Amino acid sequence: MDNISGYKDRAIESLTGKWGNSAIATLIYIIIFGGIAIAFSYGVPLTQSCSTKLDPLGNIIQIVLSPIAWGFEIMFLENIRKGDKELDLGKMFEGFKDYIRIMLTNLLRGIYTLLWMLLLIIPGIIKMYSYSMTNYILLDDPDLKYNSAIEKSMAMMKGHKMNLFLLDLSMIGWLILSIITCGIGILFLAPYNLTAHAHFYEDLKAEEQQNIAE
């Protein structure tokens, strides 16, 4: 496993020459999910005489579109594997090819995280990091789904949760910059963070394979 600086340097190297497309991909992602949040969190009247809130429907749509979130995440993993090739924005929508497995696995992941958060915040955060490799596992292990994929993520992250947390914490400066720039910085922070996560996963996978070989 690499150190924090190593993952950040590798992320920047992987995104060199691709920051523009990465920002465009992030903007598309924000527009899709941000638009849904605005439309359904604040409520859209069905008729002039009906002001019923559509929050439940909005939540359902968020779940239905979860493969896009999966695709956005794995797009950066595929990017580091491709090397010098252009960032493939189409990867963001590939989750719909394996729709049920991805959607239901992430639904379970979200439910488990929420239940832990309802108990205590810190255990919830710990579990969130335990489950953080699930989407990558869904990509690399097509036969795994639901609890099996989540459990494999938990096994891979055993002893590494703090490392990933500290990696995320080290990017707080970027987060502050995103706030100062009225959110513009997030167009670059998200690709940077997810690319660092992708490198982290690749090292976890290599470590797992080495342990199996031994």
Spans of features found by a protein language model:
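Hydrophobic alpha-helical membrane segments
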Residues: 1-214
